Structure formats: structure tokens, C-alpha cells
Amino acid sequence: MKVLEGAVAAPNAKIAVVIARFNSFINESLLEGALDALKRLGQVKEENITLVRVPGAYELPLVARRLAESKKYDGIVALGTVIRGGTAHFEYVAGEASSGLGQVAMNADIPVAFGVLTTENIEQAIERAGTKAGNKGAEAALVALEMVNLLAQIDAA
């Protein structure tokens, strides 16, 4: 039986990180975790990482699509934070970010790792950005690298 499984180390991978500015006090912690994971665990060279800042989580899919269509990147990490408020705005932004990024991955055939926090409150977001619940930015970066390697294995099989 042949087993295909992606590894994390991807020293030659070209990775784009797209990060929302809105809720930057949380997103910057996600970014720190993602960059640390890419460089330290994934062994990705700094010159192979491109950072793109967008206004908010809603804008992540469009920019991710443009990056994917450029064919310059092996994987994309999308980072942002959407915190529930008193209106339906949360559902719209979180839903569009999630489905839009998924569509980019499927249509462009490129790993797009979802590092967008969707939380009930600020405390939950802070916990997921590097305190009690780990750093979801780092987790998303590792997912992107593993998927880059896994897709390469599938292509070579």
C-alpha cells in the first residue's frame, strides 16, 4: 500500500501570507506565529515569503485569488480575525471569507490555509492568537506547507 502524507519542511516553497489590518492587535500575533512556523519549522527562506496586507477579512479572498492566479506561489496563508458583534455583519464577513478562500483553493488548485479566527469575543481571539489555545496563524502556516508537499507527492505518484 502506498501512503502519501505531506511533510512540513518545504525550504524551496514560495508562500504568500495575506493578512487583514482590521483587528490588527490580534492579527499581528497570528502573523508572528505564521512567520515563525514558516521559517523555523518549514525552513522557508525569508526571500520566498511575500506579505500582503488587506483592509479586512472580507478582502482576503480577492487578493488570495489574484496571488494564486499569478502562479508565483506554491501556497497561501490567509490571516484575519472576525469577532461577533450585535449585528449580522459577523455572519456575512466570516461566511464570505471562508467560502471565498475555499473557492480560491479549488479553482486555482493551490493550498489556501484558513487562518481566520471567527470568535464570539475578544478574549477567545486573544486565546487563539498565541495564549491558551495556541497560535492559529502558526497552525495555518503548517497546514499550507503540508499541503504544498502533499500535492507535490500526488503529482509525482
UniProtKB/Swiss-Prot annotation:
Family annotation (Gene3D superfamilies): Lumazine/riboflavin synthase
- Tell me which domain of life the UniProt entry assigns to the organism this sequence originates from: Bacteria
Q: Name one GO biological process term.
A: riboflavin biosynthetic process
Please give the pathway this protein is involved in.
Answer: Cofactor biosynthesis; riboflavin biosynthesis; riboflavin from 2-hydroxy-3-oxobutyl phosphate and 5-amino-6-(D-ribitylamino)uracil: step 1/2
**Enzyme Commission no:** 2.5.1.78
Q: Which residues form the active site?
A: H89
Which GO terms of the molecular function aspect are on file? Answer: 6,7-dimethyl-8-ribityllumazine synthase activity
User: Where does the chain bind (2S)-2-hydroxy-3-oxobutyl phosphate?
Assistant: G86, T87, R128
List residues binding 5-amino-6-(D-ribitylamino)uracil. Answer: F22, A57, Y58, E59, T81, V82, I83, F114
Q: Quick one: a GO cellular component term? A: riboflavin synthase complex
Protein keywords: Riboflavin biosynthesis, Transferase
Q: What reaction(s) does this enzyme catalyze?
A: (2S)-2-hydroxy-3-oxobutyl phosphate + 5-amino-6-(D-ribitylamino)uracil = 6,7-dimethyl-8-(1-D-ribityl)lumazine + phosphate + 2 H2O + H(+)
Pfam families reported in the protein's UniProt record: DMRL_synthase (PF00885)
What role does it play? Catalyzes the formation of 6,7-dimethyl-8-ribityllumazine by condensation of 5-amino-6-(D-ribitylamino)uracil with 3,4-dihydroxy-2-butanone 4-phosphate. This is the penultimate step in the biosynthesis of riboflavin.
Under HAMAP family, the record lists: Lumazine_synth
Quaternary organization: Forms an icosahedral capsid composed of 60 subunits, arranged as a dodecamer of pentamers.
Q: What family is this protein classified in? A: Belongs to the DMRL synthase family.
Protein's recorded name: 6,7-dimethyl-8-ribityllumazine synthase
What organism, scientifically named, is this protein from?
Pasteurella multocida (strain Pm70)
Source species taxonomy: Bacteria, Pseudomonadati, Pseudomonadota, Gammaproteobacteria, Pasteurellales
Gene that produces this protein:
ribH
